[in-house]
A protein has these predicted regions:
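Signal peptide-directed extracytoplasmic domains
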Residues: 7-178
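Hydrophobic membrane-insertion alpha-helices, especially the h-region
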Residues: 1-7
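Bacterial extracytoplasmic/cell-wall-associated proteins, especially those involved in peptidoglycan
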Residues: 102, 120-122, 136-322
Length: 322
């Protein structure tokens, strides 16, 4: 079945008796099932996109397109196109249909590859190999630690037959679009580059996965600690270093893990993100809350929120309450 993501447009006959589309705006056709070219005319008429299927059917037959298949997906056409151009464009796009690709915020690149491959006709092993390829990292200005910061989760329109390499190029293009001058100015004002901002955002995200409205406040706390040359002492970084993301409680033995990601042991930011970061958290870091807090502790109410404090004495009080 074919659905339209646009209200309506008509085909009319101009002075040269040539069928043209009556406006210049685009129309998006959404095809839920594969459609034979011989069926296109009737479908367009049923959706009030053509006055009659006769001309387009004759043209399709003349071009020997009738046995071709328009695969399910989304196709963008223009109102101003002639019938001839409409048929030609649909023929060119028949195997390049568009889908909404959801790039999720997940724990690591392995999970991401599985999610992407399930939506596209991709080899997940090949895609993961490319994600770990140092030449790919260098090509786009990253390294093995920072490459995951290039992924900006969102829903994007892509061709279903996109290759693994083209997908990475597409992801890189969306990264560049996301980091516009406004965001870059804010990052520069903080004194960090994009990967460092994303790394900090990944810690904020993994620290608070329930109450999103607390992200900017937590970001402000970590920025205060960085400015004060204090260790971040962020539990999620230790869990990442241990490869134990579901560890419920950290003990002193865990804090001794020798890893650059262990922010209990080393000052500053870890070398790269500890997850694929939701862009909203990146924005929360760029627009962090300004305060003097340097400690936080989960509230005893188990509400998902934290008690924040600016002194160790106050922090110890909250710890006892918890």
């Amino acid at each position: 079945m074919l659905y339209l993501i646009f209200p309506f447009f008509n085909l009319f006959i101009n002075k040269e008796k040539k069928e043209i589309l009556s406006d210049t705006n685009k129309v998006i056709l959404k095809i839920q099932e594969d459609l034979s070219f011989s069926e296109i005319g009737d479908y367009l008429v049923s959706k009030n996109l053509l006055l009659s299927p006769k001309t387009i059917n004759q043209l399709i037959e003349f071009k020997n397109f009738e046995n071709n298949i328009l695969k399910k997906g989304k196709y963008t056409i223009q109102r101003k196109w002639s019938t001839n151009k409409l048929v030609n464009q649909l023929f060119l796009m028949r195997n390049q249909n568009v889908i909404d690709l959801y790039i999720p915020s997940v724990r690591n690149l392995e999970i991401l590859c599985g999610r992407l491959s399930s939506q596209l006709e991709l080899d997940s092993a090949k895609l993961l190999h490319l994600f770990y390829d140092e030449n790919i990292h260098e090509k786009f200005g990253f390294n093995s630690y920072t490459f995951s910061s290039m992924v900006i989760p969102n829903t994007y329109e892509v061709y279903t037959n996109i290759s693994e390499n083209k997908l990475i190029e597409f992801i890189a293009s969306k990264y560049k679009s996301f980091w516009n001058s406004k965001r870059m100015d804010k990052a520069n004002a903080l004194g960090y580059n994009q990967s460092e901002i994303t790394t900090l955002a990944s810690i904020v995200q993994m620290e608070q996965q329930i109450k999103f409205d607390e992200h900017s406040k937590i970001a402000g706390l970590y920025i205060n600690r960085l400015k004060s040359n204090m260790k971040l002492q962020a539990d999620p970084t230790v869990k990442f270093a241990l490869k134990m993301p579901n560890l419920r409680r950290l003990y002193y033995k865990h804090l001794e893990v020798d890893s650059p990601y262990n922010t209990y042991k080393f000052k500053g930011l870890p070398p790269g993100p500890i997850c694929i970061v939701d862009p909203r958290v990146i924005d929360a870091v760029l627009n962090y809350s300004k305060h003097d807090f340097i400690f936080m502790c989960a509230k005893p109410s188990y509400s998902g929120y934290h008690n924040f404090s600016s002194t160790n004495k106050e922090h110890e009080k909250y710890k006892k309450m918890y």
